[in-house]
Amino acid sequence: MEKLKFAKMHGAGNNFIIFEDFENKYENLEAVAKILCDRAFGIGADGILVVRKSTVAEIQMIIINADGSYAAMCGNGIRCFAKYVYDEGLVKNTSIDIETGDGVKHAKLEIENNKVIGVTINMGIPTFEPARVPVVSEDIVLNKNISIGENRYTITSMLLGVPHTIIIDPIDKYPVEEGRLIEKSNIFPQGTNVNFCEVINKDEITVKTWERGAGATLACGTGSCASVVACHKLKLVNSKVKVNIPGGSLVVEITEDGVMMTGPAVTVFEGETLELDFSS
C-alpha cells in the first residue's frame, strides 16, 4: 500500500484525478487509472491526468481514461491541468506550453483576484483525411450517410487530437448510449468519440458526447470543438459559437491559428490515498 497525493478537478462536469509523477514512479499508469477512477472502490473519475517533466515544453500531461486506455488529448482535462500546475507553482506564467500526446498545446489562464476563473486552449487544426482520423473511407467523411447495425446516420468524422464523429440532428433523436455502437463500428479502426449535435442558431449549439474509453460524459472539450468545426464546415454556424453541454457551456472559436476553446476549470478537493494497491 502506498500514499498518493492528488486533486479532484472538473471542467464543466468532465472530472479527473490529477497527480504529480516527476520521477516516473508509476510505470503501470493503466492500472493506476482503473483503480483510482473506480467510483465504488476508488475515488471515481472519467480519467487521470499525470504531471511529468517535459523536454519539449514547460510541462507534460499524460491522460488515461477510466478504462485504462491512453488519450492523446482532452480539452476539459487540459484546462484542469493548466489550472493545477499554475495553482501549485509548477509554472510561473499565465501562458503555458503543455506537452500532450497530440503535440504541444498552448494554454492561457484568465486570472481574477489571484484565482483562475477560466482557461483558453489552442486545440490545433483538425484534419478530415480518412487515414489520419482514422476512418475507412476513400473520401473525407462530411455529412455522409452510413449504416451501423440496423440504424442509419449522417456523420462527419475528423481528427482533433483524438478521433471524433459528429451527428447533427435534434439532440433528443438518439440516446447518448447509442454512441457505444458507433464507437465500436469497424469503420473506425481505433474507435471514435461520438457527438450528437443540434444547431440552435448561428451562434449556439447543443452537444452530448459518448466518449471513447469513458462512456457518456457531462462534457467533452475536443468533442465540443469538433462539433463546431463540423457545423462551421457545413455553413450552419459562425466562427465563434457557444456550446451547451450537460455540465455547462464552453465557447469555441475557429481561427487561422487553430480552434480556440474557453471554459471553466474547478478544483473540487485535494486528498491522499491510504489503502490502495497500485502494484498490479
Task: Give, region by region, the residue ranges found by the protein language model.
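A glycine-rich beta-to-alpha transition motif near the start of alpha/beta enzyme domains, typified by
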Residues: 1-115, 165-280
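Glycine-rich beta-alpha junction loops
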Residues: 125-127, 160-164, 265
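Beta-strand scaffold of nucleotide-dependent catalytic cores
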Residues: 121, 156, 220
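Short, charged/polar, Gly/Pro-enriched secondary-structure boundary elements
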Residues: 127-131, 270
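Zinc-dependent deaminase
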Residues: 128, 140-142
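Internal active-site segments that recognize and position negatively charged phosphoryl groups
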Residues: 142-172
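Membrane helix-loop-helix hairpins that form the core translocation module of multi-pass transporters
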Residues: 100, 118-126
